Amino acid sequence: MLKINTNDLPELTWSSPKGKFAGSGKQVSEALGRKPLSTDLKERHPFDIEICRIPAGKTPYPYHSHSAQWEFYHVISGKGLVRHKDGTTPIEAGDAFLFPPDEPHQLINPDSESAQDLILYVVADNPIGESGYYPDSKKWIVRSPERRLLRCEPLDYFDGEE
């Protein structure tokens, strides 16, 4: 049995170029042997686990949905908001919620006054062939080691074929 202590894991921090999006995470699945960014089924787990930290006044990523991936969240500490297709919902320590495929969502820590981080467990089922859609910017991401982003234009099915 492989055992780790999440207190010993490094916290990887990210930020968008202009700083609107920021967060950090402890990659629990990778510490338990999952190969980062691998698409090989023998190097993946059936789910990914992350401990996500969202600083006060930030959101870790844009509003998005997944084509095939389910995501489960459990709030460890702090308070925040979840933006979803029906509006926003307040969240706090102890809350758990789930997003199925094709349901857009975004976590937000609006609490810039108390400067308290929002910390959550995130469990995703890690499907093969996953892609994501960003409704606000109308772009797609194709799940691959290169994390390619695309914007689509309406085309006829036979465009470029004849």
Q: PLM ranges: what are they?
A:
Residues 61, 87-89, 132:
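Short beta-strand segments
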Residues 101-130:
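Ligand-binding loop in jelly-roll beta-barrel domains
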